[in-house]
Amino acid sequence: MSVAKAKGAQKTVQKGIHNKVAKKVRTSTTFRRPKTLQLSRKPKYARKSVAHAPRLDEYKIIVNPINSESAMKKIEDDNTLVFHVHLKANKFTIKEAVRKLYSVEPVKINTLIRPNGTKKAFVKLSADADALDVANRIGFL
């Protein structure tokens, strides 16, 4: 009995154990190709000899301050500056431009596109910065 058992064990060791892998059941009719490794490109030379200058710098973003009556009311009551800004500028770029140009920390930016096609930005300043002082420093009061 033990000899027969040993012979059987020897046979399985020589054959190797190949478990049957269960077939994956496909539930969808479409085959989605699996995502493979995509290495980042390493070009031999630059395709442009000179990089393009920044299209929107802080001087292009803020076109001019608005000093209408309603804008003055915003400055006095809400600690908010009102600017006419570039149409392609977004809130993040406007915030960065105000920070660089006027060295104040904007808390919140609200924007709207006016009926004449220009963009207006309401820049709410932090409590420690006074909008009236900043407006005087800019020179639109």
Swiss-Prot record:
One of its GO terms (molecular function) is rRNA binding. This is Large ribosomal subunit protein uL23A. This protein binds to a specific region on the 26S rRNA. Component of the ribosome, a large ribonucleoprotein complex responsible for the synthesis of proteins in the cell. The small ribosomal subunit (SSU) binds messenger RNAs (mRNAs) and translates the encoded message by selecting cognate aminoacyl-transfer RNA (tRNA) molecules. The large subunit (LSU) contains the ribosomal catalytic site termed the peptidyl transferase center (PTC), which catalyzes the formation of peptide bonds, thereby polymerizing the amino acids delivered by tRNAs into a polypeptide chain. It is found in: Cytoplasm. The lineage of its organism: Eukaryota, Fungi, Dikarya, Ascomycota, Taphrinomycotina. Coiled coil: none annotated. One of its GO terms (biological process) is cytosolic large ribosomal subunit assembly. Keywords: Cytoplasm, Phosphoprotein, Ribonucleoprotein, Ribosomal protein, RNA-binding, rRNA-binding. The keyword Metal-binding does not apply. The keyword Ribosomal protein applies. Belongs to the universal ribosomal protein uL23 family. The gene is rpl2501. It comes from the Eukaryota. NCBIfam families: PRK14548.1 (NF011118). GO terms for cellular component: cytosol; cytosolic large ribosomal subunit; preribosome.
